[in-house]
Amino acid sequence: MAIKNHQQTAHSPSTLEKIEVVPIGGKLSDIAQTFGSTYRRLDPNKPSPTVTRSGYRDFIHPYENRMLTVRELACLQTFPLEWEFTGTRLDSYSSKRIVTMTQFGQVGNAVPPLLANAVANAIKTQFFTNESDDK
């Protein structure tokens, strides 16, 4: 199976300089305030911080000096590997300065599928529970 949405970003030398100094589980802001960034390297032994629409730029791969791909963020959000995100990968603007919904945005704005399933099942259980079962 081909894994979709797993293209790495080509980082500028200045971005790589920032990424390289962040230890596992650490944040760039803990090292130097001069960068003015919230880059954080994920700790593979801890839960991920919340994935958001705009925060995708902040997640550094635990072992590689790069940001996470759309697919890696989607895995954190519990999307199945066969799920494909469409549209542009990164922010792009139309001539009217309207931001299009990016693949990163789709992942960050989504309710994690396993969470949605758990909530739906809880509602279903409550909704279809027979009143006589409660007595």
Name these PLM-found stretches.
Residues 1-135:
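C-terminal target-recognition/interaction regions appended to catalytic cores
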